[in-house]
């Protein structure tokens, strides 16, 4: 009777296809105690056609079942009990419920894993080696693609995870040691390194960059992250350089290279692993704010007779090529060699479309916006919307495609130009100079474009025509205005070996005689290859070309002045002759009248 009733309920359960918990409680008629409990969970009973067979499989040493054995079928949300006449024991029910709930909790992770397995592999079969290797390969390739494509996002999540587990100091020390080892400069990251999700950048706060002999020899790099002392040094450094006090540079040791000690308030960086694989550096975008410090060049020595082209650097794999660079609020004190006075250099705002280590000077001249001061002299570099007029370049389609910028420097002291430079600037020892330079850059196709690849291929296949070579040059239309200049004759003649010594005295006399204002117009053309590896006006050869053009302009002015003087003399002689001729004619006209009057008397 009981088996038939249970069979009907089992059939109903199978049709509903709901998971049930079935508990069998067997009580011996002799001892009235619980002998065995088995909990089974299943959604189908097709493998167990009859309950006696099910009980026989799950209960060992069962013996003869009593007719008073209660059999309880429980669903997760409800309880159904069937009995042959005895009243159910409430203690057994409560115990069963607690055991079943704990069993469900323990089974939850297995359910989740089973669902993940079904979602990933689309099957319920046991995992094989092929499944595991395929899953691992998919996981590895996806992470590699993520690192290459979204490098900044990957590092942002990594830094965010490390910051959340209170590893900021360890992370800053590790990054500082890594950059110190790769660059030779001592880096200190005092504050937290956090991702900027809105801008897609990683923010570094309170950075110190130092290049001194002890850091290059590895002495200062052994303990570069002393957090307890760095905060005091950082605040003292900013306070000292924000004020008008003189910087303390006694600790700087001697070395034939540029030494510096800089503090950066904030740096926003984005990375690109794909650019790193191409040898362009891992940094894709860089924004700096609040730079203070000292740049010491007092111990640099060079041979004046050497060629400036020897100082150009060679390209190395891994040199940075930043796609976007911004700089705000920079103020450093520059110390020059040979006892030259120290002076401040400030940059208020700078935005560059790209900044390459190999083309540093060229990219600075090609800036979108650059404003600042050099020894309290304002300077600006900005793009021109319209093409400026130039009498040295022909109007054409290729000229219209060139990019034009303007460099303007007001009231620069002449001692910045006459140090180590031969020519007219080397003769002037007093005064100030205003520069207005219109720079024309050759057009360049965008990076990774088909046009650039096609032009490069055509340049290799055929030779460029001569009339097109002018558009591969960088052109400078220079307008120099000298205010209150004073020149002296050079002592050594080897400084003026490239000019005629006979013109030195007339030029110096012309400069000293015109002390109020002297305008100079000249044009300089430099091949684009001269800026490959150049970092300054000196090693690019622009300063030497401008000095030579200024001399030629002075020579033309002196020649024109001499021509004007001779012309004035000729005009004066002609005027004097005409005046004397008129006097003689007048005397001749008066002579007959005088003789007639005397005869009448």
Curated annotation (Swiss-Prot):
Family: Belongs to the MDM31/MDM32 family.
Annotated Pfam families: MDM31_MDM32
Protein localization: Mitochondrion inner membrane
Keywords of the record: Membrane, Mitochondrion, Mitochondrion inner membrane, Transit peptide, Transmembrane, Transmembrane helix
Transit peptide region: 1-66
Positions on the Mitochondrial intermembrane side per record topology: 156-601
Principal place of residence: mitochondrion
Organism: Schizosaccharomyces pombe (strain 972 / ATCC 24843)
Mitochondrial matrix face residues: 67-134
GO cellular component, one term: mitochondrion
Reported function: Involved in the organization of the mitochondrial membranes and the global structure of the mitochondria. Also required for mitochondrial distribution and mobility as well as for the maintenance of mitochondrial DNA nucleoids structures.
Record flagged with keyword Cytoplasm: no
Any GO BP annotation: mitochondrion inheritance
Full protein name: Mitochondrial distribution and morphology protein 31
Spans traversing the lipid bilayer: 135-155
Membrane topology qualifier: Single-pass membrane protein
């Amino acid at each position: 009777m009981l088996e038939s009733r249970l069979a009907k309920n089992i059939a109903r359960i199978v049709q509903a296809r709901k998971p049930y918990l079935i508990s069998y409680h067997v009580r011996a008629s002799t001892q009235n105690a619980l002998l065995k409990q088995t909990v089974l969970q299943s959604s189908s009973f097709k493998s167990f056609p009859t309950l006696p067979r099910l009980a026989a499989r799950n209960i060992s040493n069962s013996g003869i079942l009593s007719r008073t054995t209660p059999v309880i079928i429980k669903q997760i949300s409800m309880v159904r009990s069937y009995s042959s006449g005895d009243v159910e024991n409430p203690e057994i029910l409560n115990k069963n419920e607690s055991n079943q709930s704990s069993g469900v909790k323990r089974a939850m992770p297995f359910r989740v894993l089973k669902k993940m397995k079904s979602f990933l592999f689309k099957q319920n079969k046991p995992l094989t080696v092929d499944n595991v290797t395929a899953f691992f390969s998919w996981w590895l390739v996806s992470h590699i693609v993520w690192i290459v494509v979204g490098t900044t996002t990957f590092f942002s999540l990594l830094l965010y995870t490390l910051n959340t587990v209170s590893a900021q100091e360890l992370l800053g020390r590790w990054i500082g040691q890594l950059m110190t080892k790769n660059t030779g400069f001592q880096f200190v990251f005092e504050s937290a390194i956090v991702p900027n999700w809105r801008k897609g950048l990683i923010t570094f706060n309170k950075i110190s960059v130092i290049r001194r002999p002890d850091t290059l020899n590895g002495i200062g790099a052994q303990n570069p992250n002393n957090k307890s002392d760095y905060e005091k040094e950082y605040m003292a450094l900013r306070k000292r350089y924000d004020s008008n006090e003189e910087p303390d540079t006694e600790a700087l040791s001697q070395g034939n290279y540029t030494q510096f000690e800089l503090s950066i308030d904030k740096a926003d960086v984005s990375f690109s692993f794909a650019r790193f694989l191409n040898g362009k550096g891992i940094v894709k975008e860089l924004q700096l704010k609040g730079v203070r410090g000292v740049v010491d060049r007092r111990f640099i020595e060079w041979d004046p007779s050497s060629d400036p082209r020897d100082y150009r650097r060679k390209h190395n794999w891994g040199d940075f090529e930043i796609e976007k660079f911004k700089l705000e609020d920079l103020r450093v004190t520059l110390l020059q060699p040979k006892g030259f006075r120290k002076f401040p250099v400030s940059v208020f705002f700078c935005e560059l479309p790209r900044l390459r280590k190999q083309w540093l000077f060229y990219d600075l001249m090609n800036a979108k916006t650059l404003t600042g001061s050099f020894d309290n002299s304002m300077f600006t570099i900005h793009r021109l919307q319209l093409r400026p007029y130039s009498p040295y370049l022909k109007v054409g389609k290729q000229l219209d495609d060139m990019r034009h910028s303007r460099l303007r420097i007001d009231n620069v002291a002449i001692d910045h130009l006459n140090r180590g430079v031969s020519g007219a600037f080397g003769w002037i020892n007093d005064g100030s100079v205003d520069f207005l330079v219109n720079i024309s850059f050759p057009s360049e196709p965008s990076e990774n474009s088909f046009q650039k690849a096609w032009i490069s291929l055509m340049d290799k296949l055929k030779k460029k025509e001569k009339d097109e070579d002018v558009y591969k040059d960088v052109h400078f239309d220079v307008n120099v205005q000298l205010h209150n200049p004073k020149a002296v004759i050079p002592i050594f003649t080897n400084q003026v070996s490239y000019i005629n010594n006979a013109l030195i005295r007339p030029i110096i006399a012309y400069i000293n005689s015109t002390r109020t204002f002297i305008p100079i117009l000249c044009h300089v053309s430099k091949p684009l290859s001269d800026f490959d590896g150049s970092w300054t006006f000196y090693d690019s050869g622009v300063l030497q070309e401008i000095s030579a053009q200024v001399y030629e302009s002075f020579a033309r002015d002196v020649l024109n002045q001499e021509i004007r003087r001779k012309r004035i003399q000729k005009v004066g002689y002609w005027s004097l002759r005409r005046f004397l001729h008129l006097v003689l004619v007048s005397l001749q006209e008066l002579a007959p009248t005088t003789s007639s009057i005397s005869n009448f008397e």
